[in-house]
Amino acid sequence: MSKKKGKTPQPAAKTMTASGPKMEAFTFGEPVPVLDRRDILDYVECISNGRWYEPPVSFTGLAKSLRAAVHHSSPIYVKRNILASTFIPHPWLSQQDFSRFVLDFLVFGNAFLEKRYSTTGKVIRLETSPAKYTRRGVEEDVYWWVPSFNEPTAFAPGSVFHLLEPDINQELYGLPEYLSALNSAWLNESATLFRRKYYENGAHAGYIMYVTDAVQDRNDIEMLRENMVKSKGRNNFKNLFLYAPQGKADGIKIIPLSEVATKDDFFNIKKASAADLLDAHRIPFQLMGGKPENVGSLGDIEKVAKVFVRNELIPLQDRIREINGWLGQEVIRFKNYSLDTDND
C-alpha cells in the first residue's frame, strides 16, 4: 500500500522584529478666545432692590464695548469734541465736566449732573456723576452713587439732573441709539483679536508636512518636530534646514491647506462691520480722517461737516439745554459751529 503523501508544511510567519514607520501628526496654535458680550442685552426690565432701579442693560458692558472697534469709539469722540468746542464755559460748569457729561450721554444714553452747595446752601458748581455708577432711586428725585453694591450713597433729593435718551420700553433710564450695532462692534473686535492671536501664536503653518522618505529615522523626525514647534510665538519667521542623504525628490512634501485670508474673511468682516457702525452713529467717514471705499476724493468736507452738525449736533445741543430749565437760569450756552479757527 502506497504511503499517503502529506501536505507540505507551510513555513511559519516570521515575527516582525522591527516596527514599521508610523504616521505622526501634531497641531499648531492654541484655542483663541472669542469675546461675546451679548449678556449686556439680557436684562428684561429695570429691577428694583427697594432703594434704586437697575438699568435695563449693563452699563459695565457698554463701557467695555466702547473700545471694541475703532468705528464705534471714534464717532462718539468726534461728536463729543465738536460739542465741547462749541460750549461756552460757565462758572458753575467747567469745560472738563461738560465733556464728561456729553461722553456719558453718548455712551450710556444717560448723563447725570449734580449740584454742589456751599456751606450757606447756595449752588457753587455742577459736577458730572459718572453714569456707569449712578442709579435712579425708587423715591422721587432721589439718585444713588453705587460704585459697588456694598458702598451705596444716596444723593440729596433734587440735587441730580438726569438727561436720558428715551426708550420705548421703560421711562426710568435711557438707552444709547447705537445698541442695534453692538453685534457689529463685537464681530469687528473678534476678527481683530483672532488675527492678532494668529500672528502672536506663530501658527502660520497652514500646511501639512508629508514625509515618506525611507532614509529618515525616528531621531530625524523628532528633531524636525521639535524645531517646528519651537518656531511658534515671537520671532517665528525662521528658516528650517533639513539634510536628507539619499532622499527622494518627493520624499518630503509641503501641502498647503489654504490661505488664512480665505478662511476667516478678515477684510470683508472689517468693512461690513465698520459700515454698520458708521450707519448707526450717522457720522460721515471723512470727519474721522478716513476715505470712503471706491471714491476718488473726499468731496467737499466743509459741506459734509455743516450738514452733519445741523442734523446731529444741533439737536444734541437742544437736549443738553434742558439743564437750564432744571436750574432756572442759563448755564448751558453754545457758540455757532465754525470751521474758521480765526473766529474762535
UniProtKB/Swiss-Prot annotation:
GO biological-process terms attached to the record: symbiont genome ejection through host cell envelope, contractile tail mechanism
List keywords of the entry alphabetically.
Answer: Capsid protein, Viral capsid assembly, Viral contractile tail ejection system, Viral genome ejection through host cell envelope, Viral genome packaging, Viral penetration into host cytoplasm, Viral release from host cell, Virion, Virus entry into host cell
**Does the record's keyword annotation contain Protein biosynthesis?**
no
* Matches recorded under InterPro entries: PBSX_Proteobac (IPR030935), Phage/GTA_portal (IPR006944), Phage_portal_PBSX (IPR006430)
Q: Where in the cell is it found?
A: Virion
A single GO cellular-component term from the record reads: viral capsid
One Pfam family per UniProt: Phage_portal
Complex formation: Homododecamer.
Function as written in the Swiss-Prot or TrEMBL entry: Forms the portal vertex of the capsid. This portal plays critical roles in head assembly, genome packaging, neck/tail attachment, and genome ejection. The portal protein multimerizes as a single ring-shaped homododecamer arranged around a central channel. Binds to the terminase subunits to form the packaging machine.
**What is the similarity comment for this entry?**
Belongs to the phage portal family. PBSX subfamily.
How is this protein named in the record? Probable portal protein
Species: Escherichia phage P2
